[in-house]
């Protein structure tokens, strides 16, 4: 895909590495943070059924979080579809930093807006 090609080029320039993992359990194993997003963003509603099938098995739930590192946090940019890409228990659980993330994003957006308006 064009996105992968662009990323691969940047990785090569930086002498880094990239790994594509298709098994969510292997992907989160030992992770300090697990980040998820909706499967179909606004404007992609017509692709919802196709994406649900493609991402089946990738719901961030309690079992998946057991594979992550001790103390791992979970993040989501919101809005979320509970029970689809993330379980309600994980979203509202003690490892969730989702609402802190949303609050911090709000403050960052306010600061940017103030700067763009001349520091009002």
Indicate where each model-derived feature is located.
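Rossmann-like adenosine-cofactor binding region
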Residues: 13-88
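Adenosine-phosphate binding glycine-rich loop
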Residues: 71-72, 78-120
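Single conserved hydrophobic/aromatic residue that forms the stacking wall/gate
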Residues: 1-8, 12
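Short, well-ordered alpha-helix to beta-strand connector turns
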Residues: 8, 30-31, 94
């Amino acid at each position: 895909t064009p996105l992968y090609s662009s990323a691969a080029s940047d990785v090569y320039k930086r002498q880094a590495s990239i790994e594509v993992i298709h098994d969510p359990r292997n992907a989160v194993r030992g992770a300090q943070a697990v980040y998820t997003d909706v499967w179909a963003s606004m404007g992609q509603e017509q692709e919802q059924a196709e994406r649900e099938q493609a991402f089946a098995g990738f719901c961030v739930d309690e079992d998946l979080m057991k594979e992550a590192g001790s103390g791992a946090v979970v993040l989501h940019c919101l809005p979320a579809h509970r029970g689809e890409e993330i379980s309600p228990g994980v979203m509202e659980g003690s490892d969730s930093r989702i609402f802190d993330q949303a609050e911090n994003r709000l403050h960052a957006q306010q600061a940017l807006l103030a700067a763009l308006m001349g520091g009002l």
